[in-house]
Amino acid sequence: MKFDTVIMGGGLAGLLCGLQLQQHGLRCAIVTRGQSALHFSSGSLDLLSALPDGQPVTDITAGLDALRRQAPEHPYSRLGAQKVLTLAQQAQTLLNASGAQLYGDVQQAHQRVTPLGTLRSTWLSSPEVPVWPLSAQRICVVGVSGLLDFQAHLAAASLRQRDLNVETAEIDLPELDVLRDNPTEFRAVNIARLLDNEEKWPLLYDALSPIATNCDMIIMPACFGLANDTLWRWLNERLPCALTLLPTLPPSVLGIRLHNQLQRQFVRQGGIWMPGDEVKKVTCRHGIVSEIWTRNHADIPLRPRFAVLASGSFFSSGLVAEREGIREPILGLDVQQTATRAEWYQQHFFDPQPWQQFGVVTDDAFRPSLAGNTVENLYAIGSVLAGFDPIAEGCGGGVCAVSALQAAHHIAERAGEQQ
């Protein structure tokens, strides 16, 4: 099977890369093993929240300039501030075209409210998520009886520290009792599958209406809206106060929805989606990827003109930690890591951890190296890249988006030259 590009990994980076390549008229396939990290995320995307020295970033342009001085090997630093902003804006356009109408500005970060009621700087958020400063003074944080993925009293306690009048309440929906037989089934995603049925909408409205008459804003867990935000908009039109949603513990409704919207758009545009499959071997001859072998296709290789590695970091097994060191398991690419295992981590858990910055070694075009030699038609994107800390620097989603589009543009340019 021949393709212009085969992408190994179906997370945020892989999907955005595929969508951008389709814009250039290239035929793409994505091989994905299972759920991506988006299923376990808040559904919001960070661009750059803090510098390596811990200084918070609000002006993105100034932050990118400072980042280049502090971390010259960061993926953003390799591209330059203006290029990062341009690619980020293009990524936002792609997301919106896929149905993910996310709120945000590449030039200026905003503060979203977290499930614990604290604030986190971010780039893009779903319109349901409350953004600071809140537009209300009288707030009620509403939990769902029996739902352990969200603790209303914890969020309320944090918000009260910001001089807000915050109460808590709990709604009990007997229609959800079918899920209560097994506590592991009473999760936000399973609740959403029931509540997203249009016949159940009035039940949720009836439960929230008495609370809405006594406050200016309801904050509740995101336990509906797996496919879209239609129910949220329907409730907002009818309730006498604003309704906002907070992400829950994973799996996350908002994260799953974002992934599904991108995946459906990729397939609609003619992309080949290979779920439940796994790349077992890549044939690389003279610095060129020629064949990709997967578990499900056995002796039938995929033959791409270009290949993209979007396999993620440790969480997605894109990187594997062993006693002897860190390795990239598919091709055995060169990995940037510390000299000894003792340097992988810091003693204090909440300090920036060195292992977060481990990843494959690439050139400025994000082409990785194998035994010191660049693989000419292979690109590495997203969390598998080295040189950045997605947690401490708050840049995980941004690096995925920016590197994906940079690789896609580079591939499209080279593909045009080869025709």
Curated annotation (Swiss-Prot):
InterPro entries: FAD-dep_OxRdtase_2_FAD-bd, FAD/NAD-bd_sf, G3P_DH_GlpB_su. Keywords: Flavoprotein, FMN, Oxidoreductase. One of its GO terms (cellular component) is glycerol-3-phosphate dehydrogenase (FAD) complex. Composed of a catalytic GlpA/B dimer and of membrane bound GlpC. Belongs to the anaerobic G-3-P dehydrogenase subunit B family. Conversion of glycerol 3-phosphate to dihydroxyacetone. Uses fumarate or nitrate as electron acceptor. This is Anaerobic glycerol-3-phosphate dehydrogenase subunit B. It comes from Salmonella dublin (strain CT_02021853).
